[in-house]
């Protein structure tokens, strides 16, 4: 025999010796020693540990060690009174840090039902299998341990394992490999025998007793040649056999006779272990999923393993059923010459599968109690079970079942292949027979069946000569339907989908006749279509559970069919369906709801919401304040600095390039802002060279028009000759700011931040799922900033200002005193435009406008027609007393305007310091006589959450 020649050697005395098995080396992720200190042990256990260590030392299983590795060791006492030594290898077993796992070689127990019936058996157990398999020499030091001394009165004794230590991560895999190698010659020589090997337990079956004896004799020799030993006291040769926890008879397989202790079931961990054990033997017991629903329900709730659980009366009955099945259940050993069949039963909750041979039960098959999808159609469950059990049969015997029996007619099977993707997958490549005739036997009669396999009430096509009803729901809790009659239902739900679900349930209850239902909620439509035959997944949301269960009960109680379909809401499509859906929408919608929806989509600011919808300032502020993204991203702003602005649209643009890394290749965002209207346009580019700038400007021209002047920084893309030539072709003048000074581009720099903030809001808190590309995201942000948002000191959007040239400032066109810092004199001028702490002043005819801080302005107190340029007296600052007297004479509010200039100037001063809180004040006194300006302080933030018209408290809420 070649295998014997390979293993045996002849010594010089002529005696055959056994060559020791070659060890399998382990793979380590680190060579850094792992040392876990040994904990103290009681004297009794310490003495037992010394005895066990000496015993292992004599057998050659351990050796003295000076290894830098250490794992704790301890002993436990068996029922027989003997002690057992164990090593705590948890630190060494750390998969992600220390040892490389080998992976399982037998992922699951073998099925004992596949042992041919009436064949004689013999079962053996290998003695101390781990201790007969050596470790690789380089791996021994990793499994060192220490035996401590009491009171440290002497040095501790240290050893290391030379054989597979129990508890090591890869010990079972190595053991299976060694035993598998030893059995391979036996399998090759006795290929007609049925041999099962699991870890160190071996079962042999043969058609005759003589062949079994021959096989066993050869197996003994091969095992001995491999250095393994058979435990003589554990050899089984007669029935009943006990193997892998089961009892084996000549034709039957029975589960172990156990009793479930209910007094120990107190925590989630206790019930988890119990149900794990029951699931392990369910293929033998045949307990359908519906018969364990209450036990599975106990696992719901708190995921803490120590959380308290209580055995309900219903669950107690189910445990009693399990105990009865344990006492009576059995499966059959197969006939190796006959084929297997699969039966699918339409049981309650979910279908049940049974593998049979003729009329003999081989194994039960079940689906999990919990599903992944909220609704799983019963037909889809059947298809999943068929696919799952087909794979199981192939795993058991290597072949597909010969026949599959299902509770469907031939026509229903044909329709299932046409309409159900799950059915097509479950029966893919099946070449056997699909039948609906079940074998006549009593073993299946206890199963509780369901009739809800295929829809009976729900239709997939519109019904003729039936009523048409439109439904709608709103997040304000209103549900409604319209059709032959209208009805509005006030619900407790703050979800539009749940309100719509209530509307559909109400329609199904109110109309006891065939109906067609049209809803604008795709979610509700799909749920209603599937619910009739679906298994509803349990949800922690009790309200949702109640709604879905009520919907299913309502559908199943109906006597007349219905059809439900989806229609898109808020479209401009013509036709009666759109109009009828709008009518249903009007029953539940309001301006507030629409404002909330727009903000969720675009994150428009308060003033923009107030301008677009008929809502109050408080309602608009509440919408923005309840938006998580707008609160997180609403950062304090700083004044933009001294930057001359255009006096009309397209007079002066500022342009810059910013970066958005999430856009990938298109991360270069070219931004242009009109300094008069604040209209913004931006494009995504792959760079910032001159060609990219030109491409961006052409896009700006198409949207904004052509400017007179553009201001940029000193970047190479803006200073190139090609760019200057491009501007000259379009008759555009070009200026640049001071190099390395971002304040020269303060307006566009502020715009960059505003644009990025809007992008983040829409990405992390937006409801739009269609903006997938960078340019689409950018366009949505630009739409919000230009056409929806209204900024402080404005009454119109930037787009309206840019297209119409409409002015916002109430001070424009008024005569003022302005201070000339060069001459230190006060001059008379006229305000051209006003904003952000600065004003553009016209000194006189044929003179260029001047930009000055508003703190250098005072309103002129004489009639406009009498205004003349000052002489010596005019170089003095106008006195407030004059203003007061003129105020009293004319009855106007110019004094207020003067205070406004001082307040805004003061805010502008603060804006230039580190202590500036980015809030400027503007007084807008409503009637003469008010002396408390703080009551009318307005916020200066461009995207003020209070719309710039709130009380003084706005300052803290916006900051």
From Swiss-Prot:
Keywords: DNA integration, DNA recombination, DNA-binding, Endonuclease, ERV, Hydrolase, Metal-binding, Multifunctional enzyme, Nuclease, Nucleotidyltransferase, RNA-directed DNA polymerase, Transferase, Transposable element, Zinc, Zinc-finger. Its EC number is 2.7.7.49, 3.1.26.4. Mg(2+) 2 binds at residues 472, 585. One of its GO terms (molecular function) is zinc ion binding. Transmembrane segments: none annotated. Residues 463-593 form the RNase H type-1 domain. Residues 645-806 form the Integrase catalytic domain. A zinc finger (Integrase-type) spans 590-631. This is Endogenous retrovirus group K member 113 Pol protein. The gene is HERVK_113.
């Amino acid at each position: 025999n070649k295998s014997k020649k390979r293993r045996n050697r002849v010594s010089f005395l002529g005696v055959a010796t056994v060559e020791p098995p070659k060890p399998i080396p382990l793979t380590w992720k680190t060579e850094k020693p792992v040392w876990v200190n040994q904990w103290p042990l009681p004297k009794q256990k310490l003495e037992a540990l010394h005895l066990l260590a000496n015993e292992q030392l004599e057998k050659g299983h351990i050796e003295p060690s000076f290894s830098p590795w250490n794992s704790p060791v301890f002993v436990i006492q068996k029922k027989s009174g003997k002690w057992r030594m164990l090593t705590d290898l948890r630190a060494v077993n750390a998969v992600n840090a220390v040892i490389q796992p080998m992976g399982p070689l037998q992922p699951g127990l073998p099925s004992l039902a596949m042992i041919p019936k009436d064949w004689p058996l013999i079962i053996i157990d290998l003695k101390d299998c781990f201790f007969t398999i050596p470790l690789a020499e380089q791996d021994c030091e990793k499994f060192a341990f220490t035996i401590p001394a009491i009171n440290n009165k002497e040095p501790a004794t240290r050893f290391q394992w030379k054989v597979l230590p129990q508890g090591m991560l890869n010990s079972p895999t190595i053991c299976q490999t060694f035993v598998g190698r030893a059995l391979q010659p036996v399998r090759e020589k006795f290929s007609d025998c049925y041999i099962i090997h699991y870890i160190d337990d071996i079962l042999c079956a043969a058609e005759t007793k003589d062949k079994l004896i021959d096989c066993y004799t050869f197996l003994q020799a091969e095992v001995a040649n491999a250095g393994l030993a058979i435990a003589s006291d554990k050899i089984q040769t007669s029935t009943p056999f006990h193997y892998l926890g089961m009892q084996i008879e000549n034709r039957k397989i029975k589960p172990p006779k156990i009793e479930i202790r209910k007094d120990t079931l107190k925590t989630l961990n206790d019930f988890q272990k119990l149900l794990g054990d029951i699931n392990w033997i369910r293929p033998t017991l045949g307990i359908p999923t519906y018969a364990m629903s209450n036990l599975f329900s106990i696992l719901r709730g708190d995921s803490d393993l120590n959380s308290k659980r209580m055995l309900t009366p219903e669950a107690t009955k189910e445990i009693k059923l399990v105990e009865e099945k344990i006492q009576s259940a059995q499966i059959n050993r197969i006939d190796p010459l006959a084929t297997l069949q699969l039966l699918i039963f339409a049981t309650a909750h979910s279908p049940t599968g049974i593998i049979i041979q003729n009329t003999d039960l081989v194994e039960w098959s079940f689906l999990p109690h919990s599903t992944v999808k909220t609704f799983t159609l019963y037909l889809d469950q059947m298809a999943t079970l068929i696919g799952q059990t087909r794979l199981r049969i192939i795993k058991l015997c290597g072949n597909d079942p010969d026949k599959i029996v299902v509770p469907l007619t031939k026509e229903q099977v044909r329709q299932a292949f046409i309409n159900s993707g799950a059915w097509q997958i479950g029966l893919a490549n099946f070449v056997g027979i699909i039948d609906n005739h079940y074998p006549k036997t009593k073993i299946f009669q206890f199963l509780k069946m369901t009739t809800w396999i295929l829809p009976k009430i729900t239709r997939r096509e519109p019904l003729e000569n039936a009523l048409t009803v439109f439904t709608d729901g709103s997040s304000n809790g209103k549900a409604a339907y319209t059709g032959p009659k209208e009805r509005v239902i006030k619900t407790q739900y703050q979800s539009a989908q749940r309100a719509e679900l209530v509307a559909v349930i109400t329609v199904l209850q109110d109309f006891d006749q065939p109906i067609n239902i049209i809803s604008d909620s795709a979610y509700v439509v799909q749920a209603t279509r599937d619910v009739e035959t679906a298994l509803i997944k349990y949800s922690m949301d009790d309200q949702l559970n109640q709604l879905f269960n009520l919907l299913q009960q309502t559908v199943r109680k109906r006597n007349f069919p219905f059809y439900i379909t989806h229609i898109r809401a808020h479209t401009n499509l013509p036709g009666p369906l759109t109009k009828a859906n709008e009518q249903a929408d009007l029953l539940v919608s309001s301006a507030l709801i629409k404002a909330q929806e727009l903000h969720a989509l675009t994150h428009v600011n308060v003033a923009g919401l107030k301008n677009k919808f008929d809502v109050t300032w408080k309602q608009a502020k509440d919408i923005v304040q309840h938006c998580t993204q707008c609160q997180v991203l609403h950062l304090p702003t700083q004044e933009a600095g001294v930057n001359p602005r255009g006096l009309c649209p397209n007079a002066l643009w500022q342009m810059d390039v910013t970066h958005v890394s999430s856009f990938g290749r298109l991360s270069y965002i070219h931004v242009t802002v009109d300094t008069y209207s604040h209209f913004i346009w931006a494009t995504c580019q792959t760079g910032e060279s001159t060609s990219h700038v030109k491409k961006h400007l052409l896009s700006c021209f198409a949207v904004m028009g052509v400017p007179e002047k553009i201001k940029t920084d000193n970047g190479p893309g803006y200073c190139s000759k090609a760019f200057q030539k491009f501007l000259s072709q379009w008759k555009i003048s070009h200026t640049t700011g001071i190099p390395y000074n971002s304040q020269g581009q303060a307006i566009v720099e502020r715009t960059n931040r505003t644009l990025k903030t809007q992008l983040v809001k829409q990405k992390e808190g937006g409801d739009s799922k269609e903006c997938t590309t960078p340019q689409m995201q950018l366009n949505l942000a630009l739409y919000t900033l230009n056409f929806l948002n209204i900024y402080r000191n404005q009454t119109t959007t930037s787009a309206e200002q840019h297209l119409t040239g409409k002015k916002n400032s109430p001070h424009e066109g008024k005569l003022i005193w302005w201070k000339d810092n060069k001459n230190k004199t006060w001059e008379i001028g006229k305000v051209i435009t006003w904003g952000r702490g600065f004003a553009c002043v016209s000194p006189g005819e044929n003179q260029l406008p001047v930009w000055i801080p508003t703190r250098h302005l005072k309103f002129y107190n004489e009639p406009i027609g009498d205004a003349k340029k000052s002489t010596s007296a005019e170089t003095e600052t106008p006195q407030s007393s004059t203003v007061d007297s003129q105020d009293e004479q004319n009855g106007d509010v110019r004094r207020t305007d003067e205070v406004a200039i001082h307040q805004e100037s003061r805010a502008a001063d603060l804006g230039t310091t580190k202590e500036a809180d980015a809030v400027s004040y503007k007084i807008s006194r409503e009637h003469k006589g008010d002396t408390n300006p703080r009551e009318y302080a307005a916020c200066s933030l461009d995207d003020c959450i209070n719309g710039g018209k709130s009380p003084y408290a706005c300052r803290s809420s916006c900051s």
